[in-house]
Every structure is written in structure tokens, then in C-alpha cells.
């Protein structure tokens, strides 16, 4: 086993030991996916309400201080529902290149917000963070939530390669997906991680066969470990 895997296995062992104590605060990750899967329907005549309902449990990931992608997309759906429908249809079209459709979604939202009033439109909140969230909620066995600072710390601790800081944000997002693919693969190898979920999941929580939600949770777990080590 190489050094990279040794480091990853070390932190996975620690994550396993800490999982139970973190569960109540972190289970929103699995709930966010299931809520989205149960409610998302682009044919719904009330598009803003549908988006609001579908992303209700992802609010923690999508709205916080000075960052309002959820509020922004709901607001734009009220103003231009047909355009927003088309944007999501293209974003979720797996026949198209991932990088191209992610950039197209972000740029379309940026153009659409011009002329809109309110704090949600002062800047383009439909960044790769937001785009990755939509992709993950729609295809939880393929994608992940992306945040550069989290990915950077995971890479630092596990020594799994990650994009250069100067690369375009979409490249960083895709690089993070690749990194978390490696982590989810390790999680699937051991029954003990699956057992942790099976003992806790109910109908309100996504089953997570691919262990992508758990890989995300592992990434969130790594971040405070990294920050404590720098104090």
C-alpha cells in the first residue's frame, strides 16, 4: 500500500470512530438528497415553489453570510421560469460535457440577474459551489458538493492530488469530484462503513449506495481537523 493510501486509511479509521458523535449534526447531507429526489419536477407549474421545496434541506450548503445561491435561483425562477427550466434541463443533460454545461449555467444566471433588485442579485451566486450542489442533488451517485477550501484540506491531509490554485474554478470542481471518487471507493470496500449507515438511515434519508454522501461528510470532518492542527 502506498503512502497516499496509508494516510487516507488513517483518517478513515479516525472518521469511523467519530461518526456516531457527529451523526445528528451531519445527517442533513443524506436528508437534503432525499428531499430533492422526492420533490424535484421541472414540469411543476409553480417552479419557484418547487425549487424552494426541493432544496429546503440543502439550505445549509446553499445560503449563508453574503452567499445566497438558493434565494437567487428561486427569485430568478419567479421572474423568468421558462429560462430557469431550460438552464436546469441543460445542466442535468448528461450527454453534454460537464465543464461546458456547468459554465453555461453559471454564465446564464449571471446575465439574467442584471436589472434585478435585491441583495441576492448584487453578484452572481451561481458559482461552481452552487452548480455542484444541483448536480449532486440530482445525481448523488455521480457527483458531490464542491467547496475549494474543503477540497484543499482533504488533499493536504490525504495527499490525494487536487487541482492547482490558479486553475479555473470548474477544473477545481471536477478535480474534487475525482478526489472524492477515490475516497468513496475506499468507503465501499469496507462493510463497517456501510453498517454505520444501515443502522441509521430511514425513509427520509438517502440510501447512498455509492457512498458519495459519506465521502462528502468525511471531507467536512477533515476540515476542522486541519484547522486545529494549525492553531
Predicted regions: what they are:
Residues 1-124, 140-231:
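An N-terminal alpha-helical hairpin/helix-loop-helix interaction module that forms a charged
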Residues 131-135:
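Cytochrome P450 catalytic-core helices
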Amino acid at each position: 500500500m502506498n503512502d497516499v493510501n496509508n494516510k487516507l486509511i488513517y483518517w478513515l479509521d479516525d472518521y469511523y470512530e467519530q461518526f456516531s458523535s457527529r451523526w445528528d449534526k451531519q445527517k442533513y447531507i443524506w436528508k437534503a438528497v432525499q428531499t430533492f429526489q422526492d420533490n424535484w419536477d421541472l414540469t411543476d407549474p409553480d417552479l419557484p415553489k418547487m425549487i424552494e421545496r426541493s432544496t429546503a434541506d440543502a439550505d445549509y450548503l446553499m445560503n449563508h453570510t453574503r452567499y445566497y445561491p438558493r434565494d437567487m435561483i428561486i427569485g430568478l425562477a419567479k421572474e423568468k421560469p421558462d429560462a430557469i427550466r431550460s438552464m436546469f434541463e441543460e445542466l442535468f443533460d448528461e450527454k453534454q460535457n460537464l465543464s461546458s454545461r456547468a459554465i453555461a449555467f453559471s454564465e446564464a444566471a449571471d446575465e439574467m440577474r442584471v436589472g434585478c433588485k435585491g441583495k441576492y442579485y448584487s453578484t452572481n451566486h451561481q458559482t461552481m459551489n452552487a452548480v455542484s450542489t444541483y448536480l449532486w442533488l440530482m445525481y448523488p451517485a455521480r457527483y458531490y458538493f464542491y467547496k475549494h477550501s474543503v477540497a484543499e484540506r482533504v488533499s493536504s491531509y490525504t495527499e490525494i492530488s487536487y487541482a492547482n490554485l490558479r486553475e479555473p474554478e470548474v477544473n477545481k470542481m471536477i478535480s474534487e469530484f475525482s478526489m472524492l471518487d477515490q475516497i468513496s471507493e475506499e468507503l465501499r470496500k469496507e462493510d463497517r462503513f456501510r453498517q454505520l449507515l444501515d443502522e441509521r438511515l430511514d425513509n427520509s434519508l438517502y440510501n447512498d449506495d455509492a457512498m458519495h454522501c459519506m465521502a462528502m461528510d468525511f471531507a467536512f470532518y477533515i476540515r476542522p481537523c486541519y484547522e486545529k492542527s494549525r492553531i
